[in-house]
Amino acid sequence: MAKAAVTKRHHFMIQKLLILLSYGYTNGLDDAHSLRCNLTIKAPTPADEVKCFVGEILILHLSNINKTMTSGDPGETANATEVGECLTQPLKDLCQKLRDKVSNTKVDTHKTNGYPHLQVTMIYPQSQGQTPSATWEFNISDSYFFTFYTEIMSWRSANDESGVIMNKWKDDGEFVKQLKFLIHGCSQKMDEFLKQSKEKPRSTSRSPSITQLTSTSPLPPTSHSTSKKGFISVGLIFISLLFAFAFAM
């Protein structure tokens, strides 16, 4: 019994490391000059919340919890407000779609402690004249994880259980289309704002937002450094996996 419990803990640890590995490279691409939107859906209550940031700048906050809606930072350029206003209705529509999907998704209630809650992160880097694309990360009750890359129309799950849910969601053509084209209508405004945020000197007196989980340093001028950062993250996680397997032996 004791050996089985230890083995179970090792499998759980390895699974978590694999989840980190799954998202390591994507997180390496998220920086101070990408648009990041965090969506929180708490089924079955009507509680939805959306926060969109560019680095430390909050450009949009939607909440039906306390009925608040803010768009843009008064201390920043008018472009931030324009981006927030452009994204407002598409994100509201997406929240409703996500609410319907998570409410109709069968999950292990022992893992979710009842009704599942959904956290979604959308990361949009400047398109630089190319077709606008984004990365969508889905987290259901910290138990089911999968990612959708609109640029290559590719889905990736963290484990088999997550894959079952992911496959059902990706078979919804209207939902996939909604994810892919949500940012297209606002891409010109977003690119202009991201370009300005790169050119604007960063304040040294401002405390970073708690939602900014990655480095707040400016985006390097080439993609090589970004790729290097992603691969370093993957390498560190791979080393952790080796230790996990060694302890499991």
UniProtKB/Swiss-Prot annotation:
<feature type="disulfide bond">
    <location>
        <begin position="86"/>
        <end position="186"/>
    </location>
</feature>
<dbReference type="GO" id="GO:0042267">
    <property type="term" value="P:natural killer cell mediated cytotoxicity"/>
</dbReference>
<feature type="glycosylation site" description="N-linked (GlcNAc...) asparagine">
    <location>
        <position position="38"/>
    </location>
</feature>
<dbReference type="Pfam" id="PF14586">
    <property type="entry name" value="MHC_I_2"/>
</dbReference>
<feature type="glycosylation site" description="N-linked (GlcNAc...) asparagine">
    <location>
        <position position="139"/>
    </location>
</feature>
<keyword id="KW-0732">Signal</keyword>
<feature type="disulfide bond">
    <location>
        <begin position="37"/>
        <end position="52"/>
    </location>
</feature>
<keyword id="KW-0325">Glycoprotein</keyword>
<dbReference type="InterPro" id="IPR037055">
    <property type="entry name" value="MHC_I-like_Ag-recog_sf"/>
</dbReference>
<dbReference type="GO" id="GO:0009897">
    <property type="term" value="C:external side of plasma membrane"/>
</dbReference>
<keyword id="KW-0472">Membrane</keyword>
<feature type="region of interest" description="Disordered">
    <location>
        <begin position="194"/>
        <end position="227"/>
    </location>
</feature>
<feature type="propeptide" description="Removed in mature form">
    <location>
        <begin position="226"/>
        <end position="249"/>
    </location>
</feature>
<comment type="function">
    <text>Acts as a ligand for KLRK1.</text>
</comment>
<feature type="compositionally biased region" description="Low complexity">
    <location>
        <begin position="207"/>
        <end position="225"/>
    </location>
</feature>
<keyword id="KW-0449">Lipoprotein</keyword>
<keyword id="KW-1015">Disulfide bond</keyword>
<keyword id="KW-0336">GPI-anchor</keyword>
<feature type="glycosylation site" description="N-linked (GlcNAc...) asparagine">
    <location>
        <position position="66"/>
    </location>
</feature>
<keyword id="KW-1003">Cell membrane</keyword>
<feature type="lipid moiety-binding region" description="GPI-anchor amidated serine">
    <location>
        <position position="225"/>
    </location>
</feature>
<feature type="signal peptide">
    <location>
        <begin position="1"/>
        <end position="28"/>
    </location>
</feature>
<dbReference type="InterPro" id="IPR050208">
    <property type="entry name" value="MHC_class-I_related"/>
</dbReference>
<dbReference type="GO" id="GO:0046703">
    <property type="term" value="F:natural killer cell lectin-like receptor binding"/>
</dbReference>
<comment type="similarity">
    <text>Belongs to the NKG2D ligand family.</text>
</comment>
<feature type="glycosylation site" description="N-linked (GlcNAc...) asparagine">
    <location>
        <position position="79"/>
    </location>
</feature>
<dbReference type="InterPro" id="IPR029287">
    <property type="entry name" value="RAE-1"/>
</dbReference>
<dbReference type="GO" id="GO:0005886">
    <property type="term" value="C:plasma membrane"/>
</dbReference>
<protein>
    <recommendedName>
        <fullName>Retinoic acid early-inducible protein 1-delta</fullName>
    </recommendedName>
</protein>
<dbReference type="InterPro" id="IPR011162">
    <property type="entry name" value="MHC_I/II-like_Ag-recog"/>
</dbReference>
